[in-house]
Amino acid sequence: VACNPHRVGFLGLLVTLGIVFGDIGTSPLYVMKAILHTGETISESTILGALSCIIWTLTLQTTIKYVCVALRADNNGEGGILALYALLRKMKRKWIYILAIIGASTLLADGIITPAITVTTAIEGLESISPHLPVIPITLAIITIIFFVQRFGTESIGKSFGVFMLIWFLLLGVTGAFSITSYPLILKAFNPYYAAMLLARSPEWFLILGAVFLCTTGAEALYSDLGHCGRKNIAISWGFVKTMLILNYLGQGAWVLNHADTALAVNPFFAIMPQSMLFFAIIMATGAAIVASQALISGTFSILSEAMNLHFWPRMRIKHPTHVKGQLYIPMINLAMYIGVVLIILLFRDSSHMEAAYGLAITITMLMTTLLLGFYLHSKGVARIFTMLFMGAYCTIEAIFLTANLSKFLAGGWCTMLIGGILFLMMYVWVRAMKIRRHYISTKPLNDYYQIISDIKADESIPKYASNLVYVNHASKEGTVDDKLLYSIINKQPKRADHYWLINMEFVDTPDTLEYSCETLIPDTLYSVTMHIGFRIEPRVSLYLRQVVEDLVASRKVDLKSTYPSLRKNGIPGDFRFIIIHRVYYPERSDNRQQNLLMSIYAIISKIGIDEPKALGLDTSMVVVERVPLIISQRTGSIRRIARIEE
């Protein structure tokens, strides 16, 4: 369901609850349980210290960093680490893209573990009712349904997410507040003194912080979903959500101190529920886990869609299952995520083991966001002292959390780091390979060929290839053209047409830009159309060109009626044919081993993408693909004639 990011009202706040807070809203299911399993002795000082860490982590990380600072670093209303990078990519620091792809890779890796841990923890609540219920099969069944329905879109059920999450957060707050009454001294946890004392005296402080960090793993989603809901809706909703979360954490802490002897045997989240409400709480927890999973899956699709337009990821088939703006479905990614989540569940078996795999990857994402935010603040002329204080404080905090989470590496953190590492390698190779490809594309000044193109059009001895011939021009410099494009028109097979169209695509730093400019290079013959496409917009060239042509015809800047008398008599327009110059990389030995390795990996990665006509949204019945070799070897040589010996 859509949310107007520019308006604040009850409906907008309700929708925001359903879209933004699923991940962070399910953290109470496992955070306290994870803290109890660090091995630290259960005592008042331990629980007060841990709760104080939770409260101040939510305050420093989520409230101050994300709500107060990051939400203001928007790219025309859009947020997220890639939207932030798009604002900065014109900076002189060319290496800054590495921060963006590290952050995006680890964020995507986190999206694999979140559905697994949230759904598993919710279903484990059934063990308190019936200890012999098969948790894993039920969890796998729910996960299968979640991923299966993605192809149909979630517009119909999405409308209820906001109402559901409102009930969920009220359940968290009310049950937590009721439990607090049994141990009112738990409110001392608001004093950061207890957090400092716990971390100072406990030899297991890094394990405790690793568990505490799980309370804020969903904070990055607040920033990523900025474009869906708007800063004010998120900020106001967060005030309510944070209150409910803290009440629940305090309630769980109160229960633990009242039941210190048995606390390790059960999940405190379900333990604070009245027995009569336990089954209802399990149903609600399962529903909240589904909402959180849905948000992560949708977020993954959005991130990869942005990555494609930023040339971080190969083009893949994207579907739009509903009419809701921004709702995407990428079949191959959906399948890959499903397989990944299932393997995580089968590998770790229960939520306690999954907790070890959770948190490490997202810590790195947050650290990368902090660094990019620092560059953003500097680019906006924010006082240097404030920028340095912000970066220093949050780099220190997140480095401490990273150190704490590294302690979980062997116990399970390796899993998300492996996934994140593979994704980073793919993105890094793709970026470098695209730069290499552009480097070896030879271009020529277009105006040197105006006369010969005009002559080809006028030469009736050449069979007409099409009425309108369209090329995608990959030359980056204005006024130049890909030499293989000229070779296609002039040398390979002279192509006579009534009109030649050169399409230049410029992916801009703003998210939703969709504009064009058209220049007539040869009157009534050659046109150059530049499409300015935002990083959230799909490059559907056929559709956009049709709109461009309709505009030009309506303004009488071009006459596209067929030149065939019988067709022109009936007002039928000329046909269009697209020519795609596809460069195929052929591995060759060269002295640059690093470049050879990059291009070899690139050739493998490119197999998961779709071909260029589909990537550009072209009608394949109107497309001719001309393949040419991409030669990156610097070696040159000449063939030597062998002397012929006459007998």
What are these regions (language model features)?
Residues 1-647:
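The structured alpha-helical core of multi-pass membrane proteins
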